[in-house]
Amino acid sequence: MQAPAEEFAYTLLLSPDFSRPDALAVIDVKPGSSTYGKIVHTVTMPNTGDEFHHFGWNACSSSLSPLTGHAFLERRFLIIPGLRSSRIYVIDTKPHPTQARIHKIIEPDEIFAKTGYSRPHTVHCGPEGIYVSTLGGAGKDGTDGAPGIFIMDCETFDVLGRWEIDRGPQDKHYDFWWNLPRDYMVSSEWALPPQFENGIVPEDLLANKYGHRLHFWDLRARRNVQTIDLGAQHQMALEVRPAHDPVREYGFVGVVVDTTNLEGSIWTWWREGGKFHVKKTATIPAEPAAADELPPLLQGFGAVPPLVTDI
């Protein structure tokens, strides 16, 4: 790595009961600094109820190729979605991280009108702009149509519209990543908003109604070319992690829980012979526990699941 070490880190501050606005905290990470490890600046949002989760930059290596048309884009703005509000904040970190401030607010109605999506989740800067995955479709409860990915302009931050042209069987969404030299994307599934906004729905989980598929896309054509079902009992296929070397055509996805035995698992996907393949390559067993010490959902299993949520 040739880049200089980061001097400031950014993290999110949440209000669990929505009584206060969420915020962005700037932390000094310079060794030897008198404020090392401390919050040195906070950007408090003007609204309550946003529920921050993931966030990302406006620019990165995926967006700086000369072929993208913005090879000199500056990594300057943080894009922070509100998962519950469907609002997006653009934070300017210049002229200095300790002076970070709100640059633009994209209100939910604009996202609804231009994309038909809601509940923005993951942010990745990429070859066509800023890619934002969503967990909800249209309508009040986010179930009027499938969720997906939309594109924002990486300089003006205008919402440009849906990314997908042909989604195939994809009807849920969670994470996504790509292999730019090979021109494909991989996406995963979690749930629709009624299945997570007020907590997990036990009946849906035990009935295997959460996401359990991986979708493979032609990145430039924006078309779903293959879908692989991991098996209905493998509930909540979440974080997608490709190989760091972009010429290698494999990656990983974590699955939260197997509803037959509560184990978590990690799966490897790869492309061979023009087709994608997926195989379970690691498992994490549930931890035995006394039934009377467990919530009702787990008492019949007599165990606590590891709940793989990130890899």
Question: What are the residue ranges of the model-derived segments?
Answer:
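Structural signature of eukaryotic scaffold interfaces centered on beta-propeller domains
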Residues: 1-5, 51-74, 116-127, 176-183, ...
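Surface-exposed loop and turn segments in beta-propeller and other repeat-based domains
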Residues: 38-59, 103-116, 162-171, 224-238, ...
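Beta-propeller blade signature
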Residues: 22-29, 94, 145-157, 203-221, ...
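Asp-box/WD-like beta-propeller blade repeats and closely related beta-sheet repeat scaffolds
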Residues: 92-180
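Short, conserved, GDST-rich strand-edge loop motifs in beta-rich repeat architectures
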Residues: 3-4, 11-18, 65-76, 80-81, ...
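Beta-propeller domains
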Residues: 2-73, 79-107, 141-144, 153-156
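Long, internal scaffold/assembly segments composed of regular secondary structure
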Residues: 186, 208-254
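Conserved small-residue
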Residues: 29, 33, 40, 140, ...
